[in-house]
Amino acid sequence: MLASLPASLALVVALATSASAHAAFWDKSMYGFNVTAQTFSYDNRPQVPLYDMTFDQWWFHGHKDYPPNEGDFFELPAGGEVNAIISCDKGATPFYASSPGGDSGYGSDSPCPGQPTSEYHTTGIDDVKGCCMAIAYKADVNDVQPDDFVVFSCNATCVWTMNTKFEIPKLPACPEGGCHCAWFWIHSYDSGAEQIYMNGFKCQVTGDVGTQPLGKPAVPRRCGADPDHGRPDPVPGNCTIGAKTPMYWYQKEGNNMFEDTYDAPYYNQLYGFADGAQNDIFMDGVIASLASSGASSTLTSSADSLSAVASSTSYPAHPTSSQGAASTAYPSSSTDAASMTQPYPTSSSSSSTSEAQPTSSRSSTDVQTTLSAVTSSVSADSSTVSASSTPEDVVATTSTAESINPTRSCKPRPSGAAVQKKKRKHARRLHNAH
C-alpha cells in the first residue's frame, strides 16, 4: 500500500492538472454534458481535444448517445446576440454543481481560473485565433451530416474569456423538434498540438425569426493576410463567400481541410470569417472571384460545383505527397475528387427530406454586395489591396483558372533550416505534453 502511494499521488496530480486544460462549450443543451473521464474507455470529456480520430470518435465528440434532457435548447435570438460559456472545466462554470469536482473557480471570467494561458492554447490575446458556432436545420441528430452545418457566428477573440459573445444573424425558424448546433475551435499552431474542438448541442431560433433560407455551404478557403508565412497581403478573390461549412481537420477520416501541421485553419479573416454574425450565409457558398462576374447563372453553377466538392462522401486523411507540391496560386481548401479515399460513415438513419437544409440562390446585386463586404473585411490591414478595391480589382489578384481548380495543395512551410528545426522541436515537445 505504502509503496504504491507515490504512483497514486502522481496519478491524482496528473488528473487534476489535465482537468483544467483545453476548453469546451458548456450548456445543458449540449451532448455529453455529464460525460466524465470514466464514461468512456479513454478520456472523452467535452474539453478533450480531437486529433487523429475516426469519424464516430470526433463527430459530435462521440457524444451522440449522451443527449441533453428533453426540452433543453440553447436559444438563438434572431438578429440579436447570445452569451456562451467556454471553459476548461465544468466546475468553473455556472454548472459546477454537476461537475465531479464541484466548484473549481466559478466566479472568474477566465476560461481556466488559476491556470496560465497555455492551458487554453494561447500565448496572449494577440495569439487567439477565433471560434465559431454552426447550425444544421435537422431535428434528429442521426440525420445531421458534416455538410449540413453552416457557420453562422464567429468570435475572433476566442478562447480568451469564459463569457463569450456570439452575434446571431436573422436566422429562419427551426423545424419542429429544433435544430442542431455545434461549437468549433482550432487554436494557434504555435500553442499546442494539431487538433480541433467540437461540442454539439440542441438549439432553437427565437424572437423575430427571419424568412430567408440559408444557402448551400461550401468549404472555406485561405484568403487573408498571413505575414507569418510570407504572405503579407490578402487575396479576397480566393475567399469563399456565402454559406461556409465548419473546418474538419487532422482526423483519420472525415476531413474537409488538409492543411499541414504548421498551417492550421482558423475561424478568422484568414479563412474569410468576419468577427460576429456571418450575414452572408443566405447565399450559396462560392469562390469570390467567380461571383464577381455578376451573372447569377454563373453563380448558381459555380456554387453547385463547389458544393459538390464540399459535400462529396469521400475525403482523404492527412496530407500526402500525392497531393502535389505547393503551387504558386494561393492554396485552395477544396480537394480533387479523384484523390478522395476515406468516406464519411453513413448514418443508420436516413436523412429526412422534410428537414433538409434550406437553400437559396441570390441575385447578382446581392453577390456584388457580399463580395464588396468580404473585400473590405479581409483587406482592412493591407496596404496593397485596400478596402475600397472594386470586385474587378480583387479578381485581378487571383485568376479564375486558379480559383476553380479543385485540387488543393498545402501552403509551403517557412524556408530556412533553422526555422524548420525549431518547429520540429516545438512539435515534439507539444506531442509529449499532450
Swiss-Prot record:
A Pfam short name: LPMO_AA14
Cofactor: binding details: Binds 1 copper ion per subunit.
EC category name: oxidoreductase
Ranges of biased composition (kind: Polar residues): 319-338, 396-408
Entry GO MF terms: metal ion binding; monooxygenase activity
Listed cofactors: Cu(2+)
Compartments it resides in: Secreted
Positions with biased composition (Low complexity): 339-365, 372-390
Enzyme Commission designation: 1.14.99.-
Bias-annotated ranges (Basic residues): 420-434
Keywords associated with the record: Copper, Disulfide bond, Glycoprotein, Metal-binding, Monooxygenase, Oxidoreductase, Secreted, Signal
Residues bearing glycans: 34, 155, 238
Disulphide connectivity of cysteines: 88-112, 131-158, 174-179, 181-203, 223-239
Sequence segments annotated as region (Disordered): 312-434
Coiled coil: none
Gene, per the UniProt record: AA14A
Entry protein name: AA14 family lytic polysaccharide monooxygenase A
Family to which this protein belongs: Belongs to the polysaccharide monooxygenase AA14 family.
UniProt signal peptide: 1-23
GO cellular component term of the entry, any: extracellular region
Main location: secreted
Function: Lytic polysaccharide monooxygenase (LPMO) showing oxidase and peroxidase activities that are common for LPMOs. Catalysis by LPMOs requires the reduction of the active-site copper from Cu(II) to Cu(I) by a reducing agent and H(2)O(2) or O(2) as a cosubstrate. Shows no activity on cellulose-associated xylan or any other tested polysaccharide substrate, meaning that the substrate remains unknown.
